[in-house]
Amino acid sequence: MSQNIRAEIRARFLKVDTSNVADVLDDMGLLHQGLAADFRSFSGTSGKLAGFAYTIRGQSTPYGMGGDAEKMTACQGISEDEISVWSGDGDGTCYFGELIALGLKERGCVGALADGGVRDIAWLNQHDFPVFA
């Protein structure tokens, strides 16, 4: 699928209410497609997150000095208009913050969904980078 078509699909989803999308999916027999109630927005954006998923799977563990190179490497394949989906154990350990968001945004990423902790909320708000966790 071309990038233009992907961008058009994303734009169409951003124009409609989430509840309408959920109702249509239910009518199609695609039940339970919404986020669990545990997820909530961590940034002061419109509250909408739409795009194709780029899943990053792994364990979030504390790292030593020098940064989190493995996370940055995992992000290198993301494309424009995609959402980074951080799939892990959801134990509250920080998955996501300013440095990762900055690298993703430079690659055209439009937001993130993290099964774990998030930090640097003020930066995310200032740079209009929606994050749900």
Where does each model-flagged region fall?
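Feature captures the catalytic cores and cofactor-binding loops of soluble hydro-lyases/lyases
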Residues: 1-133
